[in-house]
């Protein structure tokens, strides 16, 4: 029996041999394109595995989404806190290290890739601005989600109470296991949260004599955005762990060096008026 990852926040789409997830909330906006790709159809956006396969994957997903692959903008991601504004689909980002893109232009589709890190999609339906953010644990510590939101507020006049933030499939606290050094980084940066919420769970049994901890990065990102003024009801989580579902979703933790990359795409389409 084929598995279906649909839940109250996500819909699992199967079309022309390709499978992807979409946020139900974002489907309420007819000019908005959104998706998180799955493995099915041999989709893999990791250029190091195969540049040709990555390009084929873009062609495939654009075909089922009815999106022009020539208006895809994809940055060179390096776990930074750098967020750039995009004004043209032909904009050359070069080899600059960028982990977040924002735009208020139509017919520009922002594509970022993931293999356990949290995809954060931002949408301001009032000012028609979007963002696509790559927030791994390093990006979370650097508060890239908050920085991208602040940049949308500055560039487009977005108000936090109007912004919708969607967290795509990512490694859950159930599998995001770290040692003392990384745990301390989170405690030092987010002490105000860790004292109040169960963001860090200490494992009861040592592994090879080493104390391990499990961290909830999604909760940190949520609390950071709520603190900025986003409404809790407008922060929507997929509820899907990439490691738990590594048969359908690329995962670095599960697949190790053979890992592939999933893609998150967000864009606003220019629809013809009838």
Please identify what each model-predicted range represents:
Residues 1-274:
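Active-site microenvironment for binding and transforming phosphate-containing groups
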């Amino acid at each position: 029996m084929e598995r279906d990852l649909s839940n109250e926040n996500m819909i699992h789409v199967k079309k022309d041999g390709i499978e992807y997830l979409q946020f139900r909330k974002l489907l309420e906006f007819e000019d908005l394109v959104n998706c998180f790709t799955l493995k099915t159809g041999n989709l893999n956006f990791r250029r190091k595995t195969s540049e040709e396969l990555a390009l084929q994957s873009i062609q495939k997903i654009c075909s089922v989404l009815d999106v022009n692959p020539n208006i895809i903008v994809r940055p060179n991601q390096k776990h930074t806190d750098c967020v750039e504004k995009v004004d043209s689909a032909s904009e050359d980002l070069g080899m600059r290290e960028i982990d977040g893109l924002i735009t208020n232009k139509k017919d520009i589709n922002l594509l970022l890739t993931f293999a356990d890190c949290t995809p954060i999609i931002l949408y301001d339906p009032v000012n028609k601005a979007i963002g696509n953010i790559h927030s791994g644990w390093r990006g979370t510590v650097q508060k890239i989600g908050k920085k991208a939101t602040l940049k949308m507020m500055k560039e487009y006049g977005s108000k936090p109470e109007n912004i919708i933030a969607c967290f795509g499939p990512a490694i859950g606290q159930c599998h995001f296991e770290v040692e003392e050094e990384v745990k301390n980084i989170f405690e030092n940066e987010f002490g105000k949260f860790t004292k109040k919420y169960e963001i860090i769970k200490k494992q009861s049994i040592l592994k090879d004599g080493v104390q391990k901890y499990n961290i909830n990065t999604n909760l940190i990102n949520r609390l950071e955005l709520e603190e900025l003024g986003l409404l809790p009801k407008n922060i929507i989580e997929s509820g899907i762990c990439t490691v738990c579902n590594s048969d359908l979703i690329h995962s670095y933790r599960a697949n190790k060096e053979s890992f592939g990359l999933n893609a998150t795409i967000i864009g606003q389409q220019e629809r013809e008026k009838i």
